[in-house]
Amino acid sequence: MRSLLLLTVLAALAVLTVCYESHESMESYEISPFLNRRNANTFMSPQQRWRAKAQERVRERSKPAYELNREACDDYKLCERYAMLYGYNAAYNRYFRKRRGAE
């Protein structure tokens, strides 16, 4: 009986120590971690935003051929479904490569 009581007390202490939530373990003290649309970009300075937009324009201009092919395939539902099974290269070749050769 004594060992059962001791085991119960030890189990209760183990549960209390494991389930204890300290304030140090919290990831964020904020009530809501999400921002509304109006305040979403206030943490970036205008110069950083301009630089990010300029870099995005450069990336858009200098995309590799496989990325352009993938975007063309993403816009066409049948090509996208075929790509899920056989890959984007095979899907692009099936739906778009023949059309280019015919023109």
Curated annotation (Swiss-Prot):
Belongs to the osteocalcin/matrix Gla protein family. Residues 51-97 form the Gla domain. The modification Phosphoserine is found at residues 22, 25, 28. Its main location: secreted. Associates with the organic matrix of bone and cartilage. Thought to act as an inhibitor of bone formation. GO terms for molecular function: calcium ion binding. The modification 4-carboxyglutamate is found at residues 21, 56, 60, 67, 71. This is Matrix Gla protein. GO terms for cellular component: extracellular matrix; extracellular region. It comes from the Eukaryota. PROSITE patterns: GLA_1 (PS00011), GLA_2 (PS50998). Residues 1-19 form the signal peptide. Keywords: Chondrogenesis, Developmental protein, Differentiation, Disulfide bond, Gamma-carboxyglutamic acid, Osteogenesis, Phosphoprotein, Secreted, Signal. Requires vitamin K-dependent gamma-carboxylation for its function. Disulfide bonds join 73-79. It is found in: Secreted. PANTHER family: MATRIX GLA PROTEIN. GO terms for biological process: cartilage development; cell differentiation; ossification; regulation of bone mineralization. SMART domains: GLA.
